[in-house]
Every structure is written in C-alpha cells, then in structure tokens.
Amino acid sequence: MKEVIAYKNDLEDYIYKLRDKINSEKAKGLFNDKEKENLVEEMDKVMQWLYSNDEDLYNIHKLEEKSKNMKKLGDIFLSKLYDWDGIKQYLTKMETLLYEKLAYFASMEEQIKRGEKKDMTIETINKINEYIQKEFNNFEAKMYEIDIADKTKEPKINVNDIENMINIFNDNINKMEKGQK
C-alpha cells in the first residue's frame, strides 16, 4: 500500500510541475496549440483518475503504466524546453565571454601603449580583436537564427555545438596570445 501511495504522489507531483512548466514564460511558443491542448487534456485525465474511486488506483501495475505513459508525453515537452533554454544559456555565456575578451585585450593594448607590457605587440592585439569581431558576427548570426526559429521544431543547433564553439574560441585566443596562430 505504501508503494501505491508513493506512486500516486509521485505522479501527481510530476503533473503539477509539468503544468507549471507548460505555463511558464520559457515555454511560450514551444508547442503549437494542438500539442499543448493534447498534453493538458492527458494531464487532466490522469489527475481525474488519481482522484477517482477507480479500484485500479490500488493496482501498482496500472499506476506504473499510467505514470510511464504520462512521463513519456511530458518528457517530450520537457526535453524541448530544456534544449531551447540550454541553447539560450550557452549563447549568453558565449556573449559574456566575447565581451570579457574585448575588454581584456583593450586593457592589454593600453598597457602596451604605456610600455608596461612587452611580451605582446599591438599587431597581435589587432589580430586578436579582428578574430573576436569575426566571432561576434558569428555569434550574432546564431542568436538571430535562434530568435527567429520555429520553437515548435527541434533546434538546428544544440548546447554541445555552442560549448564546442566556446572551447575552440578559447583555444584560438590562447594560441594567438602566445603567438602561435
């Protein structure tokens, strides 16, 4: 009986959290009306069943089946939500990195001009700044793609792609700074 109650509570909790996420600001535009309507309808049916007097409520196998089916539907939604949200977070991380590098190398340029930094040249700083600007243009193009993308479809870029962009960017900056590129 404890297992049945735990399953019921888990399923109910899952549905409440899923409903909150469906109605969140981050979820706007992720699903077309029909998809959202179908998901909400299924959640409502399961919640009604959980509060009914159906004897199957005490059948652990029926509860497992309902839970599995509900989570399968909900996880499709959550996966899409996390994909799009993750992309935005990593693009923001990339943007921050680009601004930080611009500021850092502007500071380095000033140090070179004042004669405080002798291990780097203005030419190197200029090459690095050109590279950063090129990456800024790439970044802005990616942001534009994401902003205009149909959020009801799978993203054309994923978090791993952006993470790789960040790593390659950092590697290239480090090489340029050391005069290797």
Language model features by range: what are they?
Residues 1-181:
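PAZ/PAZ-like end-binding module
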